[in-house]
């Protein structure tokens, strides 16, 4: 299932280029003038706010970095992504300008509420996730597809630290259902790199780490700027 992890540019506001270090504004201090949806809003529960504050304190010494999250791609990032990776006939610019990041397309509190933190030394992403009422599968619980989505974007961010990537494979073991509006911790780790292949592991646990909700492994492929996607 070749699902686009490349559109994580939405979150990063990154500018694709041949040099990976120049592509990811997410991992730099460069400002992007857009609303950042990875900040507290009235829908966040006390548990989510508490965890967010704890990780913000970890950011003070520079070991962790909070990652911003936007609803739409900055125009320049979108244009340069298409220039490097997509045939010009693929989509018209006016069409793509209306596209929104899937996980940010619902009203605040109803869908995906999350904040991500990146540890460069550990090659790890931690996502604090609260599933809203419009993510329901079985009554009272988060839909398995929504869980797969939050795993995909969290694991993808680990891989994205190495370059622009797409999801090639995602294997998920659902252990315990996740109640709606509960807060869980999605922990993703870059395990190894083999050429353009990046292997990532991921778990979802309760905030007290006593309950393992989900385990997953993922394979991402680093894109080649000389080979358009279409």
Curated annotation (Swiss-Prot):
Membrane topology (UniProt): Peripheral membrane protein
Main location: membrane
Compartments (UniProt record): Cell membrane; Cell projection, Ruffle membrane; Cytoplasm; Mitochondrion
Pfam families in the cross-refs: 4HBT
Gene encoding the protein: Them4
InterPro entries: HotDog_dom_sf, THEM4/THEM5_acyl-CoA_thioest, Thioestr_dom
Species of the source: Rattus norvegicus
Quaternary structure and interacting proteins, as annotated: Homodimer and homotetramer. Interacts with AKT1 in the cytosol.
Lineage: Eukaryota, Metazoa, Chordata, Craniata, Vertebrata
Descriptive protein name: Acyl-coenzyme A thioesterase THEM4
PTM annotation: Phosphorylated.
């Amino acid at each position: 299932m070749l699902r686009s992890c490349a559109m994580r540019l939405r979150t990063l506001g990154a500018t694709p280029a041949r040099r990976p270090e120049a592509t990811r504004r997410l991992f730099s201090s460069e400002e992007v003038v857009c609303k950042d949806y990875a900040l507290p809003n009235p829908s966040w529960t006390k548990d989510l706010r508490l965890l967010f504050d704890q990780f913000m304190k970890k950011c003070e010494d520079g070991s962790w970095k909070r990652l911003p999250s936007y609803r739409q791609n900055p125009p320049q990032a979108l244009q340069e992504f298409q220039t490097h990776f997509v045939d010009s006939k693929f989509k018209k610019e006016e069409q793509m300008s209306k596209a929104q990041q899937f996980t940010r397309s619902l009203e605040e509190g109803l869908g995906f509420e999350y904040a991500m933190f990146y540890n460069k030394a550990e090659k790890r992403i931690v996502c604090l996730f609260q599933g809203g009422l419009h993510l329901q599968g079985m009554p009272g619980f988060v839909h398995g597809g929504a869980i797969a989505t939050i795993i995909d974007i969290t694991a993808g961010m680990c891989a994205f630290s190495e370059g622009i990537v797409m999801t090639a494979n995602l294997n998920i073991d659902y252990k315990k259902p996740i109640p709606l509006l509960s807060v869980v911790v999605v922990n993703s780790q870059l395990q190894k790199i083999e050429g353009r292949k990046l292997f990532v592991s991921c778990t979802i646990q309760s905030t007290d780490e006593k309950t393992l909700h989900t385990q997953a492994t993922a394979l991402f492929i680093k894109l080649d700027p000389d080979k358009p996607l279409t």
